């Protein structure tokens, strides 16, 4: 340019130099000849399919992303210079003539018809873009273009599950191709999950050295543990950070399921059949009601594609309610011959349905346990519709909202009393083997707590001769450890002198914590939440607020006693 006197001036410019991720080599653009497809007509049909709700994308926010891509689509470069792929169906004659055909035989026939002589054709060395080939997948794998039985049965399918990062590259291409070549959308729903990142939220790559090998994780912690971690850690369309510590915790969950099941199966083998059938206890009615609620909740969440929440709901039920509470209480009920058969039946029924709930999340351990349960029960305990051949084909458990809300509320109150006493024992370093005395004052739950006194004595480690349950507070001033659960007052006799100052400080801290909760709930219930949230959810929050206020008032009364 200087020699031709075409240079006006020279100036230095700071430029971004693109480099490859792995090797760091400079990437330079180069103009080349490629094959393109005019994709606009196909994009319009694919866009209309989503707008007309023939295809529903979950989460719905990605419909805007989908529309933006298709409304601004450009011609599609479909040729790639790769070693592997579907060859571009184009052949060249020696004179440069181009023949696009279904196969080589057809290309030669067209060449002869046009050129009138036998020639040698050369096929284009390029291959189709991967997304072009994979866009044909929903129907090409079923025998298309032939009208096969598989194509008639499986196309269109119900739902596609994939990552949000290939919504345009793959999902949109499948929709465009499906409509163009079959006249039908390839699927009715698209569920988009997020990406799995490392514990720090970084994308996994060999360069960073943060790639987690799933095979190694499965070898060390189990396939079910990894599967459950991925499912419960995900929400629709959002990335998840994969923590190995979480996988370890879910391995412990698998062990919990195994141990709980081993307990039930062992009791079936150990306890002979007893024809007596007594009325259901409060614990029986509670666990059956909670099972129904859990089945209903899990079903609803799965239908809404909230798979992580569904798995967490099942997790909390089997660990926090079935294993931690009902199994512990069943040990007391199985010691009474009049309640053994009913208790065993409920243990089996709840375990059977819970395994069905968990099967999509932890299929291997649940199938193994269920087969053992089925074999052990034989004809003694048979589900309503019999034992299917395998858990994987067993009917999904149905459930409904509890028709025994009082039983659930009463049992929850009982367990909260036990939990509160256990926490107090821990705070005061009372050995697990040491029995203590307790005075429980309640007017609202007097009958229930009196009936369940044996459970309190056993699970809270209270000495049976030193427990009093009263409806009226007629105590004289004492320095016992004082606790509150809603409107129920609990006073523990630990056979030790209680530090009044320390007890005062503890109660003041509890009152402060309750005040914070009360303030939070008052703000929540005064906000639009109260009008927009479901009525049952709002009612639960109102009930919780009432209980917090009652606990605060009772603790304040106890604080006054200590300060006198």
Identify the function of each model-found stretch.
Residues 18-23, 164, 194-198:
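Short, conserved secondary-structure transition motifs
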Residues 1-46, 70, 136, 140-141, ...:
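N-terminal, positively charged nucleic-acid-binding surface of large information/translation enzymes
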Residues 68-132, 136, 180-223, 238, ...:
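Feature 926 captures the class I aminoacyl-tRNA synthetase adenylation module centered on the KMSKS loop
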Residues 143-151:
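Cytochrome P450 heme-binding Cys-pocket and its upstream "meander" loop
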């Amino acid at each position: 340019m200087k020699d031709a006197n075409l240079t006006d001036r020279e100036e230095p410019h700071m430029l971004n130099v693109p480099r490859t991720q792995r090797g760091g080599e400079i990437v330079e653009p180069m103009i080349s000849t490629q094959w393109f497809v005019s994709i606009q007509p196909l994009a319009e049909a694919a866009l209309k399919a989503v707008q007309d709700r023939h295809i529903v994308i979950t989460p719905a926010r990605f419909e805007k992303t989908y529309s933006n891509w298709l409304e601004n689509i450009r011609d599609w470069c479909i040729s790639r210079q790769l070693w592997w792929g579907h060859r571009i169906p184009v052949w060249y004659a020696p004179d440069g003539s181009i023949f696009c055909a279904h196969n080589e035989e057809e290309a030669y026939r067209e060449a002869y018809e046009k050129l009138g002589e036998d020639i040698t054709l050369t096929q284009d060395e390029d291959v189709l873009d991967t997304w072009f080939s994979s866009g044909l997948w929903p129907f090409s794998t079923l025998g298309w273009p032939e009208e096969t039985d598989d194509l008639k049965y499986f196309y269109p399918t119900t739902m596609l599950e994939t990552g949000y990062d290939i919504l345009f590259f793959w999902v949109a291409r499948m929709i465009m191709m499906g409509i163009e070549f079959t006249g039908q959308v390839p699927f009715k729903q698209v569920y988009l999950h997020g990406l799995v990142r490392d514990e720090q939220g970084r994308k996994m790559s060999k360069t960073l050295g943060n790639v987690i090998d799933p095979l190694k994780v499965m070898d060390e912690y189990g396939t079910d543990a990894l599967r459950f971690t991925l499912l419960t850690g995900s929400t629709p369309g959002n990335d998840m950070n994969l923590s190995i510590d979480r996988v370890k915790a879910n391995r412990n969950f698998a062990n919990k399921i195994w141990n709980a099941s081993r307990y039930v199966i062992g009791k079936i083998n150990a306890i002979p059949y007893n024809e007596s059938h007594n009325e259901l206890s409060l614990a029986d009615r509670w666990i059956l009601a909670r099972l129904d609620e859990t089945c209903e909740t899990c079903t609803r969440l799965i239908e809404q594609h909230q798979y992580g929440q569904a798995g967490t709901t099942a997790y909390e039920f089997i660990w926090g309610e079935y294993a931690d509470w009902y199994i512990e209480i069943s040990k007391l009920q199985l010691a009474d011959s009049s309640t053994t058969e009913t208790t065993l039946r409920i243990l089996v029924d709840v375990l059977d349905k819970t395994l069905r709930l968990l099967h999509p999340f932890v299929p291997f351990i649940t199938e193994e346990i269920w087969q053992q349960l089925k074999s052990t029960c034989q004809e003694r305990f048979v589900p309503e519709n019999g034992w299917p051949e395998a858990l994987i084909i067993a009917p999904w458990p149905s459930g409904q909202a509890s028709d025994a809300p009082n039983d659930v509320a009463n049992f929850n109150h009982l367990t909260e009393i036990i939990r509160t006493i256990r926490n107090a024992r821990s705070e005061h370093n009372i050995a697990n083997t040491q029995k203590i005395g307790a005075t429980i004052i309640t007017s609202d739950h007097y009958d229930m707590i009196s009936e369940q006194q044996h459970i309190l004595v056993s699970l809270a480690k209270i000495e049976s001769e030193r427990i009093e349950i009263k409806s009226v507070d007629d105590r004289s001033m004492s320095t016992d450890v004082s606790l509150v659960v809603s409107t129920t007052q609990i006073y523990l006799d630990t056979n030790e002198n209680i530090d009044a100052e320390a007890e005062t400080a503890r109660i003041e801290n509890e009152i402060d914590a309750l005040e914070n909760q009360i303030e939070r709930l008052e703000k929540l219930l005064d906000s639009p939440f109260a009008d927009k949230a479901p009525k049952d959810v709002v009612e639960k929050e109102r009930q919780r607020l009432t209980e917090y206020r009652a606990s605060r008032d009772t603790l304040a009364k106890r604080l006054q006693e200590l300060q006198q």
